[in-house]
Regions:
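Single conserved hydrophobic/aromatic residue that forms the stacking wall/gate
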Residues: 1-12
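Feature for secretory/organellar precursors and membrane-associated catalytic proteins
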Residues: 16-131
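Short, conserved loop/turn and helix-capping segments at secondary-structure boundaries
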Residues: 49, 156-160
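Extracytoplasmic/periplasmic terminal helices and flexible tails
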Residues: 64, 152-157, 167-187
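Active-site environment of divalent metal-dependent phosphoester hydrolases
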Residues: 67, 148-149
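Active-site metal-binding motif and surrounding structural segment of the metallo-beta-lactamase
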Residues: 132-138
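Phosphate/adenylate-binding glycine loop and adjacent helical scaffold
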Residues: 143
Length: 187
């Protein structure tokens, strides 16, 4: 019956349009979510080992610093100050106004030795003493694998301004060591 087959065709068209609408909404929501709420990052180097391994996949929360400032010890994703086309992952060591000193393999913040139980091995700074004063709205970043990290100590633009911090790393969802998708919080 032609009348019946036309009715079925209309039903299929409505169903397909319904699926297209659902898919379009899902794509828009996913885009907005990744653009404004979270960021996905894969760590390309060993600069944060053993906290984060080369190849680990991370989720950062973009809204983390909407109502408060980054804190010393936070692990963040940010625009590399010497080439903003690259994103880096490092630990915040110095916050605005801090005096950072590196001496005999140790980091001192405002004269106090920083407790760093996350370090892979002692830092080798060849006896060189370095001092940095962190400007307003800026941060001093170091990798946890200090002897293999391209960080604030070596950049032409030493500090990361707050507006270049993209997100606070919240958790790892893929662990390279176990080769498994697993959710673990990063501290």
């Amino acid at each position: 019956d032609p009348e019946m087959s036309r009715g079925l065709g209309d039903v299929y068209k409505r169903q397909i349009l319904s699926y297209i609408k659902i898919l379009a909404v899902a794509v828009i929501v996913a885009f907005l979510f990744t653009r404004f709420i979270i960021v996905n990052a894969q760590v390309p180097s060993g600069s944060m080992e053993n906290t984060i391994l080369t190849g680990d996949r991370l989720i950062g929360f973009r809204l983390a610093y909407l109502f408060h400032e980054p804190e010393r010890g936070d692990i963040v994703i940010f625009k590399y100050p010497d080439d903003e086309s690259q994103n880096f992952v490092k630990r915040v060591i110095g916050i605005p106004g801090d005096v950072i000193q590196i001496s005999n393999g140790h980091v001192y913040v405002n004269g106090e030795q920083l407790e760093e139980n996350y370090l892979r091995e002692p830092m080798n700074n060849d006896g060189e003493e370095l001092t940095y004063v962190v400007p307003a709205d800026s941060y001093f970043m170091l990798g946890d694998n200090r002897n293999n990290s391209k960080d604030s100590r070596y950049w032409t633009n030493t500090f990361v301004s707050k507006d270049k911090i993209i997100a606070k790393v919240s958790f790892r969802y893929f662990n390279v060591r176990t080769k498994r998708f697993t959710f673990s919080f990063i501290k």
